Each structure stands twice: as structure tokens, then as C-alpha cells.
Amino acid sequence: MKSLTEHLWFETPHRRDYINITDTVEKLVRESGVQEGLCLVNAMHITASVYINDAEDGLLHDYDVWLEKLAPHAPTSQYEHNRTGEDNADAHMKRQIMGREVVVAITKGKLDLGPWEQIFYGEFDGRRRKRVLVKIIGE
């Protein structure tokens, strides 16, 4: 069995951001030499997410608006968590909604994604360095 483990690092200039990481993950799959297997892509921070969806700008905007309605950043005093000196309770909730990781099948040496599916890193409390784990296993 072959395996590859890599860490991707992100430091976004904005509090919230969505970064398409599909090409980077595909490159790692090629480097791994795995033809049939699985690829795990996992946000290693509790205010960031990895998810799969369409890479359409309107949809990314809609996510931002929808998530802010569900868990608004302000007023920060509305969250018990923020009474500890933090101001990011909303980011924890946004991550919970968007998910922690994705697992994608590798078939014939390529990510087995649907026609519009792309892998994204979602940042909900940016402006500091965070990592994403990519773990590829298979034959």
C-alpha cells in the first residue's frame, strides 16, 4: 500500500475566505502514485473547514451571506464563548455547519469528483496561519 501525507498552510488576509484547493490536492494525488484509493482532506483548526461544492462566485457569496445570517459575527457579546476574551464564537459555528473534512475516492490515479465538484478551504477566523492535512492511501 502507498501513502502520502502533506500539510497545506494558509494565512488569509480576511476574516472569512474560500480558497479552491482542488488543483493542489490533484497534484498531490499524482505525486503519491496511488491509482486506486482514498484522499482525506482535513482542516486542522476549529474555525476552518474543508468542503466540496461548485466553484461559482455567486455561490461563494451566497455562502457568506447565509452563514452570517445563521451565526452573525456581531454583536460579539451574544456568544458565551466570547466572554472568555475571544471574539470568534461565530467562526466555530460556521465551521460546524460547513464541515471538517472530505474524503474523495481516487480512481485510475485521479480524484473521482463529480462534474462541478471542487474542494475548498473555508476560513472563518483568518489572519493567522492554519493548516490542512492531506492524507492519500491506496494501491
Regions found by a protein language model. Give the residues of each.
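Active-site histidine-anchored catalytic micro-motif
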Residues: 1-139
